[in-house]
Every structure is written in C-alpha cells, then in structure tokens.
Amino acid sequence: MQLSITHPCCWTLRLLLVSNLLLWENVALVPTCLVRNGRCFASLEEMLERAVGLSEEISKQALQLFTEFDNQYAQSKQLINKNFKKCHTSSLELPKPSSTSVQTHPITLLKIASKLLSAWKVPLNDLVNNLPSLKDIHPNILSKAREIEAKSAGLLEGVKSILIQMQNGDTEDENYPGWSGLASLQSENEDDRLFAYYNMIRCEGRETQKVETALKMVKCKISNENNC
C-alpha cells in the first residue's frame, strides 16, 4: 500500500531527516579545537597565526612611535648625536641565521619571546605613566604607547598559552633582565630625560622585532616549511 505524503508516518520521517540535517549543519559550524580538562582551546597553528599577526602590529606601531618621537624631539635637542645606551634586554639574543638556527627547538624560541615580553612589561608601564610629563608631548605618541603596552600584554599571555600547549601543561618560572631606567625617565635635567625616552623607545622597537622574528621562526618550524 502506497502511503500518502500527509500520512503521520511520512511526517515523522521527514521531521527526523530535517532534524539530522540541522544537527550536521550545527556540527559543521562548530570550530575544531583541542579539548583539555573540559575546555576548548584553539589549535596550535591558529594560536601561532594570531601571535605572529599581533607581533607584526606591535612592531609596526613601535616604529611609528619612534619616528614620531624622533620628529618631535630628536632634531631640536640633538639627541641623534648622543651615543645610545645598551638596551636592558640586549642579552636575550636570537640564534643567528645559520645551521644553529635551523636546529633551535621551537620551545627555546618561544621562551626567548616570552622573556623579552616579560622584561618589557614594567618599562612599557613606566613609559605610559611618565610620557605625559614631557613638554608638548603629542597625543599620538601617548596613544601609540598605550596601544603597544596593551597589545604586548596580550601577546605575552598568548605566547604563554602556546608554551603550555606545547609542553603539555608544564610551566616553569622564567628569569628575565630587570629594568632600572625609571630614574632616568624622571630626571630633573630635561635633556637627560628626553634622551632616556629616546633611547628606551629605540630599544623597544628593536626588541619587538626580535619577538616578531622568534614567533615567525616557530611558525615556520611548526608548519614544516623549508626556508626557516
């Protein structure tokens, strides 16, 4: 006997089919992730992609910050003629482009990036808090410094999350160079104070590029690219 399409049995089958289609549709929309302790984490590749993108933004803004500060103060105060002081994180170097860098483990590179970001957490906070004391400081310089501080803090948390994932949850206390430049930023001598800011902003731009390079090297190694 042929059943009518309006027969209750047919309606039940149709409802089941629609329900199954909707179920699969919802499953397809749920992003894939790694589940640990009942929580959903982004994949390692996704986390690295975000970290690299954020590090590029920070490097770009750090260069803009230095350029604007240089244009406003360096020429008139002859800051460019002074000898730059060593950056407080200069000891945290990346492996040089050679066979050694190829053999460097991604975790080692991530730890260098983490130490650099940690070592600049206090200096960036001091920079943001003390920049307003400079005479005729441009609002763009202040806003860029604040953005760099906020994004660097976010990137540090991201790098730590990547390290936790790669080390299966294992964490360890990290030692990084301390910052002792606050007194120079608050010097009563205007020229000395300006040079302290100038040197610090230059160092910050240099070290953000290190972080960017380290993260790109990690991404390259994880992706098994040949030109790392």
From Swiss-Prot:
Predominant subcellular localization, coarse grouping: secreted
Tissue expression from the record: Expressed specifically in the placenta. Highly expressed in invasive trophoblast cells lining the central placental vessel.
Signal peptide: 1-29
Pfam families registered for this protein in UniProt: Hormone_1
GO biological process terms, semicolon-separated: cell surface receptor signaling pathway; female pregnancy; mammary gland development; positive regulation of lactation; positive regulation of receptor signaling pathway via JAK-STAT; response to nutrient levels
Cellular component, GO annotation: extracellular space
InterPro entries: 4_helix_cytokine-like_core (IPR009079), Somatotropin/Prolactin (IPR001400)
Cysteines engaged in disulfide bonds, as pairs: 87-203, 220-228
Localisation: Secreted
Source superkingdom: Eukaryota
Protein family per UniProt: Belongs to the somatotropin/prolactin family.
PANTHER family: PROLACTIN-2A1 (PTHR11417:SF12), SOMATOTROPIN,PROLACTIN (PTHR11417)
Protein name (Swiss-Prot/TrEMBL): Prolactin-2A1
Species this protein is from: Rattus norvegicus
